[in-house]
Amino acid sequence: MAFRPFGKDLGPMSSKPAPFTPFGASSTTRLYLSFLFLHTANVGFACSDSSIQPPASQNHSAFAGQSFGPGGIRSGPSIQRAPPLSASQNPQLSIGKPYRPGGVQSVPPINRIPSPSAFQNPSPSSGQPYQPGGIQRIPEPFNGIAWGPEASRTSPSVRPYQFPGVQRPNLNPQYGHDGSRNFLKDHGEHSRATSPPATSHILSRMGTDAVEIGRSQDSKRKSRSDILPDQNMGFSRRNQSPVSGFENGNLVDGFQPLSSRTWMRSPSSAENNPVRSRSNPNQLIHQEQTGNSSFPYAHEVAEIQEATRRKSSAVAPSDKPLGDDPILSQHDSQRFSTSPPTSGTKSYTLSRSSDSQFPGQPSSVNSFNNARKTNSSPATKRTRSPPVYPIEEDIPRNSFPSQDCTEGEEQARAKRLARFKGELEPIADRPVDIQLTKSPVNKTMKPLDNKQTFNSLESSRDALKGDALPDYENSEQPSLIIGVCPDMCPESERGERERKGDLDHYERVDGDRNQTSKSLAVKKYTRTAEREAILIRPMPILQNTMEYLLSLLDRPYNENFLGMYNFLWDRMRAIRMDLRMQHIFNQEAITLLEQMIRLHIIAMHELCEYTKGEGFSEGFDAHLNIEQMNKTSVELFQMYDDHRKKGITVPTEKEFRGYYALLKLDKHPGYKVEPSELSLDLANMTPEIRQTSEVLFARNVARACRTGNFIAFFRLARKASYLQACLMHAHFSKLRTQALASLHSGLQINQGLPVSDMSNWIGMEEEDIEALLEYHGFSIKVFEEPYMVKNDLFLHADKDYKTKCSKLVHMKKSRTIVEDVSAPTVVEDVSTPFPLPSLITEATIGNQQCITAHKHEMPPARSLKKQTSMRLFDKEVADSKTSLLAEEDKPMGTFVMNPPGPFVINPVVHQEKQNDLTSAGGFHSPVKLYSPFGSPKFPQTKSSNLEKQPNDDRIGMSPGEIKFSIIGDVYTNHVPGPALQQSPKSMPMEIMPVTTIAECPTSVENKYALEESVPEAAMICTLEKEFNDIDEEDEDEDGVILNQYDEEVAKAKLKLIIRLWKRWSSRQSELRERRQLAAAAALNSLSLGTPIRFSKTDQSRACGEFNIDQAMRRRFEEREKSWSRLNISDVIADILVGRNPESKCISWKVVLCTQTKSVNSSSSASQVTHSAASRWLSSKLMPHAEHSSLNDDNLLFSAPGVSVWNKWVANGSDIDFTCCLSVARDVEAENDMCETTCGASAVLFLASGGLPLNLQREQLNLILESVPNGSVLPLLVVISSCNGEHMEPDTDIVSGLGLHDIDKSKIASFSIVSIANKSQKGQEVHFFNDSRLRDGFKWLASNSPLQPNLHHVKLRELFLTHFSFSLELLKQMPDQEVGPNICISAFNDALETSRRNITSAAEANPIGWPCPETMLLEDNRKECLMVKRYLPNLDWSSAENVELLSSVLENCKLPDFEDDLTWLTVGCASGAEIENHTQRLEGCLIEYLTQRSNLMGVSLATKETGVMLERNTRLELHNSSRYHITPRWIGIFQRIFNWRIMGLFDASSSSAYVLKSDLNMSTSSYADKFLAEDASYPSCPPNLPLLHEMIEISCSPLKSPPPYDDKAQRVVETGMLIDDHRDIEESMLEKNREACRGIDLMITEDDELGERSWRSKGREAAEKKTIEKRESERLDELLEKCNMVQNSIAEKLCIYF
């Protein structure tokens, strides 16, 4: 295929030199070219048939960095265009340059610098076979002349260059004779299989003319060519260096990053520009290493860069150079898109600042080693770079104006679009290596597939026609955008939203909806992606934005979380959009996405009770929340997969894989899941991820959920973390419904289960389970405990109970929201396909240990050797600046020592200079070594001492390292030449050498073997024959120099090891001497012989011999006393009896907190002491039942965490004893804190100096929260450490526990006691002081609240006690003064007094005395009988019981009598008026009884009113003319009161407990009042006859005598009325007869007097009137019958009095 440079066709494999002339070259340049030509002839440089060949080692001369054309002529400052590097014209091919079949080589990116073949050792030619191991070594130049094989190297068209020092194992029959596959064939295969795109850094110049610095972009597919020699000698092309001082092996002096370059002087003086010199370390390094050599072409580079800067700003003013922005210097911040830029897009002048180099690549201060770097990856699509034209064009025919070039570009685009119309379909974005994302490039290219390979060769000629844009420019894929927005919200958006008032509450300044600030406004999500860089935030700003958003979550969970979530969700969505637009897929992006997912997970639970908002109301859309979490998870998992393909394992991947698996358990509200989704997701996971604990947990949950095993499901929910529980919470309702349905089907009607067991099974211990049970048709019945009972059908089987937040989940959440959302602190590691051996790191300088801070790792399956490293997050490393060192500095570094294996030494290379050692296509470039002792007459040969690792023939050395024997089994990693010249001062101590792990490349090499086509294979075979004629002599000569260098390096390394060892041994020797001196001083301080004692000491010394038995006996007794059980009642009984003398049974309870669960097993000595103290305290106070002796009657009950002790105390006599019960309860043994502290009289807290005081304070506050207000309990703080003889409160403990800040209504006083023995201070504590613990209990008993002195009464007795005194007072008052309301008021007051007595007694018991543990006693014990007799019920003071009694008394109150009775004061002149008044009064009483008080019905009220008026109404004659009806209201209402208090006989509320003091006080006050007022009132008048009798007798003269028959009828009616009344009374009172038998009769003297007076007055009236004898006899009989009826009624109604 013809090759057309500048429109001239050349045949394939043409050896004709390119017509390349240095247009516009200066005289200096021409002189240099002439000198170079002569110099080349003198050194015997063997040229091909081309006219001029460049010298092979000029990189080491003073003219290093000059550019040469393919013909060998030096390019001047006005280079028009570099011809292509074909197989015959350009004698050298760049490392990794893809071979173009037919002799067509893609245009190298032109940097005004020659290709790497122009200097130092040329890169392997296209036909060079792959060398799997070893390294290329070339002698160091001497006086600017290179020595080595380059001096006599022929063109690769004649004989391909054999890369020296490489061992070639036999990997496949199709490889060469030495085991390595031919490069041409591999390249052909790869170019058809996967040709990754080549992204370019393009520096705009003259419109469309540009200098393009090629970067290789990785494709998703891994090809075999990644491990071949044309691809950076076995290194992956995925790890490529950014734009630096070397590109394509050439010194790009002028192409320093814009952020570090400021042109302050004119181009003519560029060579003396200090700013430029300071910003280009590579130039300084080169100057240092070449003596006084200078750069004669420096002004040319300056001219080019100055023109580039002016032209780029003039042509594309909108394309602002982004490199000047420091925020663009990101590490791992960009990922290249596989889509090309849009049409018409100009090349950004993008560059990287010097501090944004790859930190993970080795750097060097020697610029020569970078001559091997190439800019285009092997087997990539061609990178067509336009020629560089100077501003001053000399020859018009080679001058291309901007307009013409633009037209040419449009024509070329149209041609390419027509030619590749069917092949330019958009392809999906593929994961791109993180290494490639380092460079902020705005242009991308798509990889070529097999169909595009041939056309790509055809289109290579377009590169010679001035078209520098990629082939796929007209594709529809969006271009890569680099954000430059400096704020969290773009200024334009911020202003627009201020005008519209579209500001969230969190963005407003002082609540103003039209005002915000830079620190508050956050970019809002829009569906239309921004295409302007100023509207997109770069990675640092995105991180700051996320930090700001998370700062809003630094608060506890509350109801404001809904509004905050709606704000954060939208803003985080905008962050995801900016990440996608910039193709940022690095570790920092992973962290951001993980935080977003955590927020969505938390919202699933915390906002589950909210519904979707309508209108302007806020709401929570569960479906939308899960949808966004799903999308975020998909992006996150793609990043995980990309990192895994590069050998990087993200520690949090397993966590989020587990979350995603929990999300796919089953369908739930807001999300539908197919049954096979979880299985597919698990199948797509790697085996390692599938076996992690998080994923296994999710699989167990899924198994329990899908099988309906609700017990296992909620057991796992208790073990889950907070986020896992939030995901599981979505299935709580469903599992609970299934659980209740299954239990319902297994129960029969009226069968049930304990509610407590059910709540434990379904995780609702502290929730409203009753509502759930009733929702599904169960009923709650209380037996010994509440039971859920099956009544009928199971309800709502198809509809779950409404979802609510679960307390089971709430128990797991952190204090603030941000703690749950933020990523946990993890140490990032790098996984390898094989396990890493254990490394023992010795820091030889400063005794520091550290890990290599590589930012990028080598991808797996890319090379035979893989170097892995540990990452440390240190963002400041990339910004650090280190000074360049002099070349005479000696190397210094840390090393790794592995005793059983080889000893490895790696160089310490500063992070900013690692790119100088790295080629554009690999993580570690093939580094050349230059020996100062090298000879020019010995070419390089292969290394003869490279050996395979034992037991693994796949393991070989990577080209970047050499292993050689030093002493025994000591090996060292290769130290690059520049690294040997660094100073120890510049070497960071946090760098550790990495370990090389071999990989099997078989799968990689054979991956695309079936994708080759027949024509391409034939072409490769043709080219392979031409390049396989290799001279074996070069290999032999290479081995000689390599062996010499090995020996020199081995000596240097051995000296380094010896020097380091000497330093370490000197320090050890110094330490040993110090120890010896200290030991000698201690020995000299000892006394010699018997100590001198004074007479005073001898006199005070006790006589007698030391008795070891006696000492051991005392120790044994002390130990027995310390560990003996402590009967609390025995210690405090006397004190409690003295404080409660009237109590027959005393109950006292102490609550213990030993903090046993807070002490870890592997703790400090102080924590071990605390653990021993907690065990000692528990064994003394709460011994196990099996450990207690059988004859110990004082221990009534013992169980884990609780014990009941007893002691009988004589109370003044041998017969009267008081039972003293004491209870010890441990709060950590039970989960219900309120039940544990119920009835507590004191609190004992075991503190420790070893545990954090803040944690102990939280534990103490947790206990005190369950203590009711007003308890005023004493607190005893027991510490296990000794604080001296005086037990003064320790200031640290008091302040640490916050004892002074405790609520005084709960804790009235506190005391601190140390239980450690005084002699044990500073020593190990073996046993503790028993006496101090006893003293502490005595203090607690003395300060505990008194036991209430209660009196058990019945409600009727309590009421009558208060009402009887008021009733006596009312009876002493005249009838005219006592009205109905006065009687009602006295009745209601007595009821209210009774209610107050009951309430005051309950309020006097805030602690819930007596403690419920007293019910644990056996029924047959005497103590149990005392408890039941003298102690009240457990719920006597409960709010429910008090409320019940109060409501009963309140319902007994009577309403006021509102009728006006003034008409009673008007007298009656006739009997008719008397009858009318009587009937009117009767009507008032009937209305009161039936309507106002609702006491009885109308019929009963009518009869009862007649009886009341007959007994308690009299007729008085005033002024001898008018009669007045005077009712006795106290008698009337006494009968009404009796009816009212019948409600107090209810059995459930018939008794109550009151304080004896209140009852005695009420009795005494009423007695005093009665005695004081008794004399002022007259005695009660005798009882009068019935009302109708008085009316008949008194008014008989005024009436006509009734006929006999009428009287008889009246008598009969009266008898019938009495009989009917008797029947009514008997039937009504029959119910209460049994209840009234035990009540004393309360018949007053008035009733007895009334009976006697009634008989006498009847007889007197009969005698006075002298009625006929028969009538008087009948009247007497009638009176007798009435008296009998009245007596029987009085006997029946005696219960009311």
Swiss-Prot record:
Keywords: Nucleus. Residues 625-813 form the PCI domain. GO terms for cellular component: nuclear periphery. Residues 120-134 have a biased composition (Low complexity). Disruption phenotype: No visible phenotype. Sac3a, sac3b and sac3c triple mutants show no visible phenotype. Residues 178-192, 215-227 have a biased composition (Basic and acidic residues). It comes from the Eukaryota. Residues 193-202, 233-243, 257-280, 335-380 have a biased composition (Polar residues). Belongs to the SAC3 family. Interacts with SAC3A, EER5 and CML19. Interacts with UCH1 and UCH2. Component of the TREX-2 complex (transcription and export complex 2), a muliprotein complex that functions in docking export-competent ribonucleoprotein particles (mRNPs) to the nuclear entrance of the nuclear pore complex (nuclear basket). TREX-2 participates in mRNA export and accurate chromatin positioning in the nucleus by tethering genes to the nuclear periphery. This is SAC3 family protein B. It comes from Arabidopsis thaliana. The lineage of its organism: Eukaryota, Viridiplantae, Streptophyta, Embryophyta, Tracheophyta.
